Amino acid sequence: PRKEVCNLIGFKNIVATLYLKNGQAVKSASDMTVMGDVYNLCQLYNDSGIDKIIIFDLSTDDDEHEKNIHTIENINRNIDIKVCAGGNINRIEDVKKLLYAGCLQVIFNATKDSSLELANAASEKFGKDKILLSISNVDYIFKHQEEIEDTFHELLVLNIDIIDALENLTSTPYVVYMPQFDIDKITTQWKDLIEKL
C-alpha cells in the first residue's frame, strides 16, 4: 500500500517546525536565538502554502509550559493550517490543554520513559488519530511494535537513517523531520526508497 501512495508523488505535504521557548520562536532545541515574532512567522507559513506546523515546546517548568500553550492557542486562532505540538507532556491534562488550544494532534517523545503509558491513556481518551510519536532509533520500534500500532496515528521520524528499518517494522504512517532543506538530497532519498518498495 505504501508503494501505491508513493506512486502518487504529486501528493506531498510540506511541514514546518517551530521551537517555542518562553512563548517565543527560537532556532532549534539547542540554539535559543529568538527568530522574531512567532505570530508573524506562523502567518508567513500559513501564507506560503505550508500544510502543517509541528511545534516543539521547549519549556522546563509548568509556568513556561502554560505560556507556550497560550502562545500555541493564539497561533491556532490566527492561521488556517493544521498545528501539532509536543514537549513537556507529563500528564493527560497536558494533552487536553494542547488539544483545547486547537492542536490537531499531540506528539509524544519516545525517549521519555513515561510516554508510552501516558500516550496509551491519551489515545483511549481522545482517540488514536490525535496521538503521534517522535522517534529517533529503531530499537524503540522493535521493542514496542504492537503498542505503536495500537496507540499512535503517525510517527515523526527524527533520524532519516532509520527509514529502511522502519519500513520493515511498522505499517504506521510517518513524517520525516529534516533539519536542513536540500531538495536534491530529499528527492534522491525518496526515489531510492520508492525503488526499494
Which ranges hold each PLM region?
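Hydrophobic positions in alpha-helices of CheY-like receiver
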Residues: 75, 79, 122, 126, ...
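Glycine- and other small-residue-rich loops at beta-strand/loop junctions that grip anionic moieties
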Residues: 64, 84-88, 108-111, 158, ...
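Short secondary-structure transition/capping segments
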Residues: 65-68, 95-97, 118-122, 186-190
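Hydrophobic, well-structured mid-protein blocks that either form specific transmembrane helices
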Residues: 93-139
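Conserved beta-strand positions in the central sheet of alpha/beta enzyme cores
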Residues: 54-55, 106-108, 132, 156-157, ...
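Conserved N-terminal beta1-alpha1 strand-loop-helix module at the mouth
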Residues: 2-81, 89-93, 97, 128-133, ...
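Catalytic cores of alpha/beta
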Residues: 83-102, 167-169, 173-176, 180-196
